[in-house]
Amino acid sequence: MEDISEEQEFKYGEHSLQKIKVFKYSSTNASTYIYIHGGAWRDPSNTFDEMRPVLGIPNANLIGINYRLSPEIKHPEHLIDILRALRFVKQNFDVSQITLLGHSVGATMILQLLHYRQIIRDGLKHTHKDDLSSLDNLFAYVNDNVLLSQVIFLDGIYDVVELLKEYPDYASFVDDAFVSNKHFADSTQLSSANESLDLPFSLVSKDTKFLIYQSLEDDLLSMKQTHLLIDYLSSKNQGFTLHVGNWGKHEEIFGKYREIVFSGNVP
């Protein structure tokens, strides 16, 4: 792929939302940042364009992922789209030192990716789509070709069961993305009873850095979800770095601090 200095969109599937946007790219760049937006699995106002304010990150490829939304699709179809997008990036661009960052349910999907085979398999059982044969090639390619140097969790949802205990009104968007209580309970490692989720993480190595950010001014998510993620990673002996600060409301996505946070630094 030739260098890209002005943003371009590329399709990784047939649906209008199955696209990535490349904001800048050069095969000589030392690192690559790939962003997964949030929006409660359903909000069309959240898109890959949330990456645009961080163009000042130096010597880096910057890519955002769009994916299909609920209620048109249910979990784990959003996650499958992310895998397809990652495969497209690796097949078409010379990228290394990949940082994958996600905001809100984008962070949820980064957590899910750590056990994507099990999470997707369990999710499809609930939507009566048990045939995984069509996904075998996708799984194999991602497993063999995608290695993340850094993952960044940004004001995320990590346990939907606990989320609804704290915010019962959020059932409206959860119901759009899932078909039952068991479906969303099985959707992340923190609430699932599937013993296969004790397997080692996928797509990362012992050298992968885990960064967690939480704005103390977030008006939609308290620190509880972040504490739950911290407890989970600690139980797996996975090291991480936690950063908290007064960095704006949830939909401001760190506001004037976005570029600093998205680059993995501290405002």
Curated annotation (Swiss-Prot):
Coiled-coil residue windows: none
Reactions accelerated catalytically: N-formyl-L-kynurenine + H2O = L-kynurenine + formate + H(+)
Keywords: Hydrolase, Tryptophan catabolism
GO biological process: one example: L-tryptophan catabolic process to kynurenine
Motif mapping: HGGXW: 37-41
Notes on the domains: The main chain amide nitrogen atoms of the second glycine and its adjacent residue in the HGGXW motif define the oxyanion hole, and stabilize the oxyanion that forms during the nucleophilic attack by the catalytic serine during substrate cleavage.
Self-association state and partner proteins as the record states: Homodimer.
Name under which the protein is recorded: Kynurenine formamidase
UniProt organism field: Candida albicans (strain SC5314 / ATCC MYA-2876)
